[in-house]
């Protein structure tokens, strides 16, 4: 056994990109630095890579609670592929390898965003899509795919947790807020 990568605070979702050995991770970053720090992220995992925890984050940004510690690591911190809202609580992720959705979805990442618990304005509570543009590389962008788990008064009625591609090509999403499993099917435009 050996350490493959380090400095990843909380890699909750871990998935291998189909037909490759490339690992991707959805990470819940650190808390207690306010509403807007530190962003959660989704990224491919570089063999031997260092992702900053606990001293650094998002490249060369030092956690103020560790000011002046380990300056030699600053330039080793890998910047993630896709930066999410802080406290989104990105949990499980999957690569879409089904055939039910349009062709442009194949190979893309779908991730469940469980939602914030420690932020003044709620974020997350959705399923997102990270387009890989048939190249296997993320552009840094993501889009909302399944939303509506927070109603106008701020009440949360659903929290996506697990996600997988079903044998028919639909997506299955577990939800520990409504105690449900959702099936997302494509029925055409």
Residue locations for each model-derived region?
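Loop/turn residues immediately N-terminal
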Residues: 30, 178-179
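Conserved small/polar residues in nucleotide/adenosyl-binding loops
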Residues: 1-5
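C-terminal substrate/ligand-recognition segments
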Residues: 161-174
């Amino acid at each position: 056994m050996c350490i493959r990568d380090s400095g990843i605070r909380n890699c909750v979702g871990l998935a291998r990109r189909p037909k490759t050995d490339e690992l991707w991770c959805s990470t819940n970053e650190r808390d207690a630095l306010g509403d807007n720090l530190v962003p959660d992220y989704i990224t491919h995992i570089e063999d031997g890579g260092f992702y900053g925890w606990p001293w650094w984050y998002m490249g060369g940004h030092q956690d103020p609670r560790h000011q002046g510690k380990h300056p030699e690591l600053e330039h080793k911190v890998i910047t993630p592929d896709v930066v999410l809202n802080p406290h989104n609580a990105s949990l499980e992720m999957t690569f879409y390898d089904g055939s039910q959705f349009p062709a442009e979805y194949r190979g893309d990442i779908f991730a469940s965003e469980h939602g914030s618990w420690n932020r003044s304005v709620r974020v997350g509570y959705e399923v997102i899509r990270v387009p890989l543009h048939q190249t296997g590389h993320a552009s840094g962008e993501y889009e909302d795919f399944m939303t509506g788990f927070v109603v106008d008064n701020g009440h949360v009625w659903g929290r996506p947790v697990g996600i997988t591609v079903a044998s028919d090509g639909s997506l299955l999403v577990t939800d520990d807020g409504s105690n449900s499993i959702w099936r997302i099917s494509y029925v055409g435009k």
